[in-house]
Curated annotation (Swiss-Prot):
Name of one Pfam family that matches: Ribosomal_S13
Any GO molecular function: tRNA binding
Oligomeric and partner information: Part of the 30S ribosomal subunit. Forms a loose heterodimer with protein S19. Forms two bridges to the 50S subunit in the 70S ribosome.
Gene, per the UniProt record: rpsM
The organism's taxonomic lineage, starting at the top: Bacteria, Bacillati, Actinomycetota, Actinomycetes, Micromonosporales
Keyword Oxidoreductase found: no
Family statement: Belongs to the universal ribosomal protein uS13 family.
Keyword tRNA-binding tagged: yes
Gene3D superfamilies for this protein: 1.10.8.50, 30s ribosomal protein s13, domain 2
Protein task: Located at the top of the head of the 30S subunit, it contacts several helices of the 16S rRNA. In the 70S ribosome it contacts the 23S rRNA (bridge B1a) and protein L5 of the 50S subunit (bridge B1b), connecting the 2 subunits; these bridges are implicated in subunit movement. Contacts the tRNAs in the A and P-sites.
Domain of life: Bacteria
InterPro entries: Rbsml_uS13_C, Ribosomal_uS13, Ribosomal_uS13-like_H2TH, Ribosomal_uS13_bac-type, Ribosomal_uS13_CS
Gene Ontology terms describing biological process: translation
Protein name: Small ribosomal subunit protein uS13
Amino acid sequence: MARLVGVDLPREKRLEIALTYIFGVGRTRALETLAATGISPDKRARDLTDEELVQLRNHIEANYKVEGDLRREVAADIRRKVEIGCYAGIRHRRGLPVRGQRTRTNARSRKGPKRTVAGKKKPGRK
């Protein structure tokens, strides 16, 4: 199994798709990397030679921030926003959407499952 920057690439997938399993590499970066190294995007990950793996590894490490480094940077950015108390930091702290999405309805993935609140009691008949 081919390993790049600590990630096992799926053997049966085309390289264009397999490279997107690396955090920080999407379709565009995958295609840029393959073009720069001269490897066909249609090639399967299982067919990579050791030389091609080294080329891919060197190109990705030299040009992009990926995996652990990128995760640490994103976490540090969020932590900084929370510490300075800016609007985005407050939204992160409260677990609400940060980028202006509506919250009256929806936003369930950010807010978590609904928590039922007791309603107002109706007075009984006599």
